[in-house]
Amino acid sequence: FINPVRKSGLTKRMMGIHPERSLPGLANPAYMKAYEKGYSVESAADHERAVILWVDEFTQANDPMLVGKACDVLGALGYSPAVVCSPSGRAALSGGFLPESKKLAQKALKKLQNAAKTLKNAPILGLEASAVLSAVDEYGRLLPEEKAWIEAQRIATIDKFLADDLPKLDRASDAFEAYEEEILLHVHCHQKSLESAGDTAYVLQVLLGAKVDRVKSSCCGMAGSYGMKRENYDMSRKMAELVLLPKIESFEGEVIVATGTSCRHQIADFSQRKAEHLVDTLWEHLRF
């Protein structure tokens, strides 16, 4: 499941990564093929509450189990998820590799358009904010000929989708065991900028009855691959130490939710705590 070579100092030196940084594992691609087969577009075609779950490159490589959990959560709320796996091009775009990011965006849009056509323009949900919101914010400039289609779709993080839909659902919280303890929440920068910092908190409050303490900070300091680089390590840590790390150190509760994969990586590297995705927290409290 995880390539042991990734742990070596030589690998980090070759990639320009600081030696104190951990590297994420790489999942077997067979996981995604199984999800796309098990939650196919065709199987959701006759469902009036079909949704397209767009699985990005970060989730595919680093956290594949999140896909199955998301499908369980969506299913418990009455949706029929169709899994579409395609890299968003976010990493290439952040690195300045525009031709490569454009190719990946074109490929992703083609798969999403095909799914949306079959599913009558069903909502498109993403698990990683930086990836799914690339389509919302940047695909229109990369692919101006697709701008009208993009703007006509409902494309959002799963956090925002649920926050918007929960008022329409009857007794949605019945699908979950209550968790009335405090949850510490850190929201990804893309979400704060393009959606709402309150969406994730609202979902946790409505579905679990949780008390949510949102970390009022700016960037966690990872900023995609920025914090991984050898020359940026000290600055990345200083950014985390401004607000985020002290807040985590003083938090006495059990559950920390961080909505970005880079945010969770930063917390794991610089604290003794593990942060989880919103979907992880909801799944752990499902009434199976």
Predicted regions and their residues:
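Iron-sulfur cluster-binding electron-transfer modules in prokaryotic oxidoreductases
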Residues: 1-288
